[in-house]
Structure formats: structure tokens, C-alpha cells
Amino acid sequence: MCGLKFGIMLPIRGPSDIPGPKSWILALQYQYDKLNLETVKQTAFIAEALDYDSIWVVDHYSTSQTRQRLECWTTMTWLASLTHKIRIGSLVLCPLYRHPSLLAKMASTLDNISNGRLELGFGACPSYNKAECNAMGIPWVGPATRIKMLKETIEVCKLLWSETHANYDGEFFSLKDAFCEPKPLQKPCPPITVAGWGDRMLRLVAEYADRVNFGGPELVSERIEVLKSHCESIGRAYDSLEKTLSIAVVLKRTRSEYLDDMKKRFIADGGHGNFDDWLGRAEEYYVSGTPEECVEQLQSFLELGFTSFMIRFGDMPSLDDIPLFAKEVIPHL
């Protein structure tokens, strides 16, 4: 696929449970009335058949926005048993949900089950996870503590994946003569992606990650400069980090079809205010339009050094955009 990597975020959640008008982001992303396991499965099959590089699963229990959600690890394991070559990843794991020794064991097991196809995406649990944690009885902590916990989580996992007997004495986690067997098939371990924007998270990226993931197109160029600075300060080559971007795509064959589709989404969002203003806000956040327009928008990210994209297609549960993007967008990049 032209030397670039394209993955698909799987639709493992149901519709928004928010009554009345939804946010324009939700209106763009989710246009279906229930969680559909068949749609999840067929998305994975089509992605593999069209040579997409990867499929990705978010890590949530449930939220105030959506009660219907599939759990991350059991979903990835299910999909590993159904597919053969496509890579399977988490985007992103929350360090508050699982002890890292358990996480390391789960990851090693799934890497073996999938014949070395596991991708591990980590984050530090953004603020909207707070309500989810409170509902589930998971203690919520501030951002600095979450970042420290993420750092220790990655350190513990790497120790267990590399050492015969691991010992660790951290602020939050510890190991005493611990072991994890079998080791992951991928050496030294499954690729680690860390998602984040802030200065402290980008420092962690520079120190521990194989890849950085930005969660949208806003402020990307400025944040890249911060990441470069962190890499320089620790003596790491910036180019050794793969740059990945999560994007949402709304794709139609013609401009007329695209505008008709966006007007339907505008109405689904409540239809308040001016459509052109609403569309302008949406187009700041999304890669959208005709195939030619999407190619042009993606080119700007290639110029910034991005080589991998995790796509949330906006036409779900329809699967039409997946082959259209593969045939009319990717070959022109």
C-alpha cells in the first residue's frame, strides 16, 4: 500500500445514549441504531481482503455517551481467531484498568495466538474516562499520576517480556521474581504506540514508544516540534519514531453526494444554526469530501512525516467507504 500504513478503527460501540441533539462529532461518526457484531466482523474481513495494515479497538467499559460497548481484549482475541494476516491493536489502553503484570501476560498470550500480529497502543486516560472509572469503582487520579502509572506500566511489561525473572519496585507497581512465559513472538516485544499531546506525554513517547499517535489533526505541527525537542534532549533520533494519526473520514464519490450526506448529519445533530458554519467546524477535524479532496488533505500530513493512519469511517454501519478509500485514495498518495 504505497509504503504507508492504513488501519481501521472498528465500530465496537452502539449509538449515542444522549437524548436529543448530539455533538457534531458523534453525529459524524456514528449513524447506526445498535451495536452489531456482524458489522464488526465484516469490517475486519473486508479490511484484511483489501490489504489494510491493521484493525484497532478502543479500551472502554461503558460511558455516559454509549452504554453498548465491547471489551477491548476479548474483542481482539475474537478477531485474531477470525483473521490471518491483518494486525490487531488497542487504541488506547488505559493504565488504570489492569495491573501491568496481567496486561503483559494477556499481551504475550495474544501475540502467540495471533502469530505475532499484536499492536499495543497506550494512553494516560483522558478526562472523559473519569465518569467511567467512577461508575466502575476504579479510583481516579490526576493527570500527572496517570502519566507516572503509564510509565511504570510500560516498564513492567517490557521487563516481563524480556527477563527470565523480573523484579521491579515502583511507586505504583512492583514485581518480585516474576516471570511471563511464553514470551511474545515479536522481538523484543509487540510495537508500542503511545497516544498523547501534552509535554509530559510526549516526553514519555520519546523515552519508551516505537510510535507516537496524535488523536486528530489539530495543532499537529506545533506538537511535532515539542516531540523533536524531547527526542533531542535524551539523544534519540526523531526519525526512529513512527508518526501515526487517528482520523475520521467521510468520503463520497462526488461533491454533491458529500454535501447531501453532511446535511443529513447536520440534521441528526439537531439542525441548529447555520449549516455552512457547522460544516466548517467538521471539516477542521475530519478528512472529508471526494476522493481527490481526501488525497489533498492527507498529503499535508505526509509532508509532516506521518506514515500511518488509523481511520474511523463515518459511514458505519455501511462498509462502502472502506473499498472506496482503498481504491480511490490510497493509490494516489
Predicted regions: what they are:
Residues 6-10, 55-57, 87-90, 118-122, ...:
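Hydrophobic faces of well-ordered beta-strands that scaffold small-molecule active sites
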